[in-house]
Amino acid sequence: MRYRKTEIWKSVDWITILLYLIMVIAGWFSICGASYEFDNVGLFDPSGRPGMQMIWIGTSLTLIFVILMLESDFFDIFAYLIYACVIVLLIATIFLAPNIKGSHSWLVLGPIRLQPAELAKFATALAVAKFMNGYGFKLTTVKNFSITLFLIFLPMVCILLQKETGSALVYLAFFLMLYREGMTGYILLIGVCAVVFFVTGMKYSEVMVGITPLGELIVSCLVLLITMGLVGSVRKDYISVKIMLGGIASTFLIGYVVSLFVPVNFAWISIGLVGAASIYLFYLSIRNWVWHYALIALFALGSIGFLFSVDYVFNDILEPHQQIRIKVSLGLEDDPSGAGYNVNQSKIAIGSGGLSGKGFLNGTQTKLKYVPEQDTDFIFCTVGEEQGFLGASAVLIVFGLFILRLIVLAERQDNAFGRVYGYSVASIFFFHLAINVGMVTGLTPVIGIPLPFFSYGGSSLWGFTILLFIFLRLDASRKER
């Protein structure tokens, strides 16, 4: 018998909805605290940000009702069409959007501003979920993996062309979902290594030990260690590991003895050892007809190539404001009144909140507008100042429970479409939370992404609400089958 739509309210996951409402309400109060002015005419006045956010919340509730009343098959049937429409909208935004703070990511329609990048997240998740739900789909085949990456990277490239780097980086969160669906963990390892090598190469690029560049030495030594670890873990070839370790140790020992008489660049010795290890691995690959050795060798050589490309990427590809933010985050440059101003004022606001905070509407740093973007990207510092460590911890706990609940719901799906979409949703929320909180506390560079359900803005709230409640509709439909 056809599942009755009136039963949707019984089958929908009310735990997730409760957590959603808690965060939306807490977010509205945080916006009130961040936007409060001494001559404020009223928190519900639509001319102010709290009043406007209340309107966005009301329209979001309407969106929730519409989504839950739709048949769950709607999202499967029209996934590609929704994705195509959003891609067209992203491309149009590149050419039609005005320059706002250096990016072309907002479509302005009279008093309304819309950021299509926020809507692209759920559209991409739907398209990827539909493709991976295909008959006989296996992520391990080159064709399927390539098409999946294309679906993820196409909107990412469009958003990069809008000069909205922060929103584009969010799409890297899909790799967490791909890992759950069978992608090898070595791809995640490559991503982690790229970040570590970039940060290390940048932070110690100008530090010299004698004539040895410390950054190049550290990275090349890490490459050697990881290469030997991969040979041992992937192939269980401990004899080759011992041979490589012996060669590396003896070469460094000889270099040390020589350095007692003449200056020696140990970085070049280490890089040379990476090359020698790669040649040895290629030899093993050809001799034993095992392609794993060749892949490990390519990883080692690619890592060294990446190391030498760091300066080019940093100086010629990244925008000047991005370069300054990275330098400030790594401690390479002190700019308390420039690029580092936001983060410094944010940390002052959070620190001044103490254990229990200054109370609602009593935050001096936020009330006096010391923190730029304090009701959008830096909204978390308002929580820290007004509610203190306890309030900030409570917000993180609620977010943690929310993401864990999404994972539980994703795992209980009876088809790949719902599971893939669910893990995409959980991954996106996790990425936003980790980067935004890290950004506000100075742990990560400032890339300008909102804190879900807390940051001011209709596009952000709508985007996250649609993203979430499509999944809740898919989850509720399990009882229809």
Features from the language model and the residues they span:
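Transmembrane helix boundary and interhelical junction motifs in multipass membrane proteins
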Residues: E164-L169, G357-G363, Q374-T376, I447, ...
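Helix-boundary and loop/linker segments of multi-pass membrane transporters
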Residues: I8-W9, F145, L368-V371, Q413-D414
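Hydrophobic alpha-helical transmembrane segments of multi-pass inner membrane proteins, especially
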Residues: L19-I22, W28-S30, E37-D39, L43-S337, ...
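Transmembrane alpha-helices of multi-pass inner-membrane enzymes
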Residues: L225-G229, G442-K479
